[in-house]
């Protein structure tokens, strides 16, 4: 999974016709090349534009409102112990920015965030309510990924033990599902890969149909599949678009199958 919340945070979903404030576009091939317009998130189907991560959405909550909210939550015996030792270690003055708003629910980024995401232990934090009546919904570490429509999941890309065929327009890579999928062979469930090519990088975006909810978390070795490029990889870096920002594709410690 992309994020394990402590406790469980409610996923923030919406339809394309009625987006909550701060949410960008769901990932589609047409915007794979423009990170300023896609939505990124830490899990679930909701997200926000990368452009709001450094300073947050303007004009939503004031410093006084948030400090008062943090003070109230830290005074609540239901939350005090966990919040004081984790999310709000710095107390009411913990740095924050608003990432997303869904009605009376606010998703905040705590700690240091930049346009590339959280840094140095920064977290996401969700609270709901209004001045004088706040409740904590959850939060956790954030491993950013572009947000997908419901029913799809990212697969992780790795290089094979023999390395990449840099002279081919169809270099082989390994794919691994990131959700619990009962150890299934992911290949029948893969979508069409999207490759964004520049003079220095090739970024692969590859998804699969999400497994059933009752899937077990039995793992399996990466499966051998081929990317389709417009020109040979050459000396360009191969990046995995299942993260934000995309990360360098590296060799798996487990031999690929298939």
Q: Across the structure, where does each feature detected by a protein language model lie?
A:
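Extracytosolic low-complexity repeat regions of secreted or lipid-anchored proteins
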Residues: 86-144, 201-252
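C-terminal motif of bacterial Sec signal peptides marking the signal peptidase cleavage site
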Residues: 7-11
